[in-house]
């Protein structure tokens, strides 16, 4: 009996020693162990672990992180009511001030550097605003019509609603290439390829609304053939009247250009200004003497109007090239503008001189 009790005591002492070496019971997990005897340590350990897991998750999502300043900047662009507010310049800002403001905003809102929701749309708005305000003609028309026609709204409401006359002739991507030497300083460019969740949401909602509208319109359409015919009857009447009018209308006796389909294949010149024109084979029978003289005056007037219009187009083209060369400081555009000949303007000057001399 004494030997048995001695063995039990030795077993108890061995168990106590094992517990002391492990510092906690075997069935208690290490993370829930409280070394100081209070439950606050366990709670603090759990909170620290959760914080570390959240930090690791945010670091894994670094490509889509954005700062509060970037988000506020996008929201400011969305609230702008005109192009001057978008660029943050006054209405009498010079070209240099516009370029400086654009460079600053383009670097700040480029999709490669700003991942805030709506940053891509804000970047487009900045590029469009600069492209319009940097063009003297478009800026003059924009200032004349006012800024109530130009609005920038959130992506979930509606995309851009810019006044069509003030749409830019150059895209934000082309502007960025011009200012930053064909590539953006941050490296690889995927301009406008970042589609935000808001944009996906808008397209899904817009598609759903459009489908719903189409269904409603189909339900409202008349289902009978007679009703459809009654609706198309006014259109058919207009088409028939137009065809009859064209059949009854007589072709003019001349053309300033060669038109074999209408029979204008015989070349002639006016006696006064030597203006070339074309007639059909029956022209000599219908026009002689005074009637021919009056007709040639009409031909010369039409020809001068045509040359005047062509001269205006040539001047407009040369002016646009000159403006672009000055805006982008491109020597090739400048040389092209200087070498562009105004042939129709030279013809117009000669014709006016002959007309005054005659």
Swiss-Prot record:
InterPro entries: DnaJ_domain (IPR001623), DnaJ_domain_CS (IPR018253), DnaJ_subfamily_B/C (IPR051100), DUF1977_DnaJ-like (IPR015399), J_dom_sf (IPR036869). GO terms for molecular function: Hsp70 protein binding. GO terms for cellular component: endoplasmic reticulum membrane. The keyword Glycoprotein does not apply. It is a single-pass membrane protein. PROSITE patterns: DNAJ_1, DNAJ_2. Residues 82-146 form the J domain. Keywords: Chaperone, Endoplasmic reticulum, Membrane, Transmembrane, Transmembrane helix. SUPFAM superfamilies: Chaperone J-domain. CDD domains: DnaJ. The chain crosses the membrane at residues 228-248. The keyword Endoplasmic reticulum applies. PANTHER family: AT29763P-RELATED, DNAJ HOMOLOG SUBFAMILY C MEMBER 18. This is DnaJ homolog subfamily C member 18. It comes from Macaca fascicularis.
